[in-house]
Amino acid sequence: MQVLTKRYPKNCLLTVMDRYAAEVHNMEQVVMIPSLLRDVQLSGPGGQAQAEAPDLYTYFTMLKAICVDVDHGLLPREEWQAKVAGSEENGTAETEEVEDESASGELDLEAQFHLHFSSLHHILMHLTEKAQEVTRKYQEMTGQVW
């Protein structure tokens, strides 16, 4: 298990990012055969499988991909838009929307920062929990629970 070496305040974004990265790296060390996670559903509250939820393999690959961004930074904006949107139409519409918002003078940067910052904090904590759940479930499946 990877141990955190940096000391930041408990709710600092850097602490949350470090915790997430450490948990995903731990998950990668524990899960030796990721294909075992295919078609295995994550248990929800009460031990019941969540309907329409992705399987553990999907979570595993998503958590690893996000961790690469957390560890190494984001792709350049153009590459990211091409990868996610698949076309330039979405990127053009988004650029026009930002320009309209800036021109109208309604851009409250501080409020937007706090909204995105708190959302990022919440999402990273949720993803950290998912990495722990994938690791725990894999250990249960392979008899490695201790």
From Swiss-Prot:
A single GO BP: regulation of lipid biosynthetic process
Keywords carried by this UniProt record: Cytoplasm, Lipid biosynthesis, Lipid metabolism, Nucleus, Transcription, Transcription regulation
UniProt keyword annotation of DNA repair present: no
Tissues where the protein occurs: Mainly expressed in tissues that synthesize triglycerides.
Subunit note: Homodimer. Heterodimer with MID1IP1. Interacts with THRB and PLAGL1.
Protein family (similarity comment): Belongs to the SPOT14 family.
Protein name: Thyroid hormone-inducible hepatic protein
Native source species: Homo sapiens
